[in-house]
């Protein structure tokens, strides 16, 4: 049975470590003992210079998840030496997280499911980089109310929209705006 293990990699090199692991696994032809290699991340949307930009936000910077064939020895999960050495000797890998240096332990199935669900949700619906709350002051940076300040009244994360009370002629007027049209003031 394959279980998920957490590998500590140099921060900023998670993707290259994941690719190096995939390459090494296929070069040695032991794909049957490995499953997915994953850098848990989600897509976030932010406004920069008036443009909507999509970027990636890693859930666990400096860590890579890898599925490895696991057997049980005295009720304790173990991986074979060849798999251990393949991961441990990959450039920019510092080691496994959990267990001991030479006997890593997998994360629980529940933890793995939560992480995989978050990755799936992030891929299906990019979330805004900045989160808003009712009662918070914001500045409109795009559209007909550009440069107006307002107070957040409602937040709709499903549609990435806000209802903001903007002062127009000295009166608060509710205006519906996209997350990308405002910034925290």
Swiss-Prot record:
- Which Pfam families does this entry report, sorted A to Z? KOW, NusG
Under PROSITE patterns, the record lists: NUSG (PS01014)
Which organism was this protein described from? Xylella fastidiosa (strain Temecula1 / ATCC 700964)
Which Gene3D superfamilies does the annotation name? Answer: 2.30.30.30, NusG, N-terminal domain
Q: Which HAMAP family match?
A: NusG (MF_00948)
What range(s) does the KOW domain occupy?
134-162
Q: Which InterPro entries match?
A: KOW (IPR005824), NGN (IPR047050), NGN-like_dom (IPR006645), NGN_dom_sf (IPR036735), NusG-like (IPR043425), Rib_uL2_dom2 (IPR014722), Transcrpt_antiterm_NusG (IPR001062), Transcrpt_antiterm_NusG_bac_CS (IPR015869)
Write out the entry's keywords from A to Z: Transcription, Transcription antitermination, Transcription regulation, Transcription termination
| GO CC terms | cytosol
Q: What does this protein do?
A: Participates in transcription elongation, termination and antitermination.
What is the recorded name of this protein? Transcription termination/antitermination protein NusG
The answer to whether UniProt assigns keyword Transcription regulation to this entry is yes
- What is an annotated GO biological process for this record, any one? regulation of DNA-templated transcription elongation
In which family does this protein belong, per the annotation? Belongs to the NusG family.
Q: Which residues form a coiled coil?
A: none
Q: Does the keyword Transcription apply?
A: yes
Q: What is the lineage of its organism?
A: Bacteria, Pseudomonadati, Pseudomonadota, Gammaproteobacteria, Lysobacterales
């Amino acid at each position: 049975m394959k279980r998920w293990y957490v590998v500590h990699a140099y921060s900023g090199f998670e993707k290259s470590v994941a690719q190096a692991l995939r390459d090494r696994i296929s070069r040695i032809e032991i794909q049957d003992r490995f499953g997915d290699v994953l850098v848990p991340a989600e897509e976030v949307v932010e406004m920069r210079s008036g443009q909507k930009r999509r970027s990636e936000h890693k859930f666990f910077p400096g860590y890579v998840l890898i599925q490895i064939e696991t057997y049980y020895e005295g009720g304790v999960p173990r991986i074979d030496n060849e798999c251990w050495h393949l991961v441990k000797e990959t450039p920019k890998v510092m080691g496994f997280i959990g267990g001991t240096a030479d006997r890593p332990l997998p994360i629980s199935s529940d933890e793995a499911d939560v992480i995989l669900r978050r990755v799936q949700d992030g891929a299906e619906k990019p979330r805004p980089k900045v989160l808003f709350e009712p009662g918070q002051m914001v500045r409109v940076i795009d559209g007909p109310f550009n440069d107006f300040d307002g107070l957040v009244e409602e937040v709709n994360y499903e549609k990435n929209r806000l209802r903001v009370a903007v002062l127009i002629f000295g009166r608060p007027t509710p205006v519906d705006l996209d997350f990308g049209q405002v910034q925290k003031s």
